[in-house]
Amino acid sequence: MKIDANKEKALSAVLGQIEKQFGKGSIMKLGENRSMDVETISTGSLSLDVALGAGGLPLGRIVEIYGPESSGKTTLTLEVIAAAQREGKVCAFIDAEHALDPIYAQKLGVDIDNLLCSQPDTGEQALEICDALTRSGAVDVIIVDSVAALTPKAEIEGEIGDSHMGLAARMMSQAMRKLAGNLKQSNTLLIFINQIRMKIGVMFGNPETTTGGNALKFYASVRLDIRRTGAIKDREEVIGNETRVKVVKNKIAAPFKQAEFQILYGEGINRTGELVDLGVMHKLIEKSGAWYSYKGDKIGQGRANAGKYLVENPEIGAEIDQALRAMLLGGGQAVAQSATGDENVDLETGEVF
C-alpha cells in the first residue's frame, strides 16, 4: 500500500516524537520486528492443548478457569505449574482459599521446594502481591485460587451481615486495569480460578455466573469451563473423574472447542490414556480387537495395559506425543469438536449456555 508523501512525512515526525517522549517500542507497525507466534505453556492435557489451538495457555495474558466444586480446577492449574517448572520457569501460587495441599501438588509433579506460595489476608493484599511479582519480571506463571476468596479489606474489618455491594467487583476491575499491561511487558501468565454462583430469578438461558464482576470476563484472553461428567471405577472403588473442558473464550485461536480427559485421584491428568485414545483416533496406534500395537509391536491388551506400557516406556510415549502435536497443532487440525453448532453463546462474554 502506497501512502501519500506528505502523510508519510507527518507520520514519521509524529512517530519520532512519540518514541522520544515514551521510549523506543512504544509504538510500532504490527508486523515489524516482533514474533507473531504466542508463547504457550502446556496444560498437561494434550487434547486441551489442541482445543486451545496454540498448544497451551498463552504467556503474557490473563486466563480464567471456572467450574463447580471438585471439578478439577486446582488440579488443572497444578498441572500447568508442573509443566512450566519442567521448562525451568518460576511459578507462584496465591492461595486465597488457604486450602493448597503440598503433598497432593508434589504427587502431580510440582517442585514444591521452588514454588512460591502466599496466603494473603485480604483481596487487596493478594492482588498487590500479584502486581509486585509481575513487575519484577522474574515470575513466569501466577495462579490465584480463587477470585471468590479475594475478600475486600472493608468486608473483613466489618461485621457479618454488613452490606458491601459491589466492593469485590470494583477491586477486581481496578486490578485488571493495572495488571493487564504489566503482564504483557513481563510475559507472565496469570491464571484466576473462579467459582460458580446462580443468578436469582433467571427464567430463560443459563442462570450460572462467576464471582468478582464482569471485568475479568473481558480482560481474560482465555476462559475455560471445567466440568466433571462421570466417575472412573476400578470394580466398586471410584478412582477418578471423567472431565470435560470447554474453551468458552479464546483470543489466540478459534474458541468454543472442547476437550475430554480423565483425572485420576492422587495422580492428576491421565496422559497415557489420552495418548492411547488420540493415537488410535489418528491412526498412530493400531487397534485390533482388544490389542493395541505401535509400529507393528503389541503394546498391551486393553486400554489400561496399553497406557501402563507407555508409563514403563516413556521414550515411546514421548514419541507418540510429539507425533500427535506435530499432526494436530502443526497442521492446524483440531481434535475437539466446535460447540457452536448445538449451544447458545453469549457473544459479549464468550460464555456457552
From Swiss-Prot:
An example Gene Ontology biological process: DNA recombination
GO MF entries: ATP binding; ATP hydrolysis activity; ATP-dependent DNA damage sensor activity; damaged DNA binding; single-stranded DNA binding
The entry's keywords: ATP-binding, Cytoplasm, DNA damage, DNA recombination, DNA repair, DNA-binding, Nucleotide-binding, SOS response
GO CC terms in record: cytosol
A Pfam family hit: RecA
Secretion signal, residue range per the UniProt entry: none
Residues annotated for ATP binding in this entry: 67-74
Top-rank taxon: Bacteria
Major localisation: cytoplasm
PROSITE patterns in alphabetical order: RECA_1, RECA_2, RECA_3
Xref: SUPFAM superfamilies: P-loop containing nucleoside triphosphate hydrolases (SSF52540), RecA protein, C-terminal domain (SSF54752)
Localization in the cell: Cytoplasm
PANTHER family: MITOCHONDRIAL DNA REPAIR PROTEIN RECA HOMOLOG-RELATED, RECA
Function description: Can catalyze the hydrolysis of ATP in the presence of single-stranded DNA, the ATP-dependent uptake of single-stranded DNA by duplex DNA, and the ATP-dependent hybridization of homologous single-stranded DNAs. It interacts with LexA causing its activation and leading to its autocatalytic cleavage.
Family affiliation: Belongs to the RecA family.
Protein name: Protein RecA
Organism: Shewanella loihica (strain ATCC BAA-1088 / PV-4)
Lineage: Bacteria, Pseudomonadati, Pseudomonadota, Gammaproteobacteria, Alteromonadales
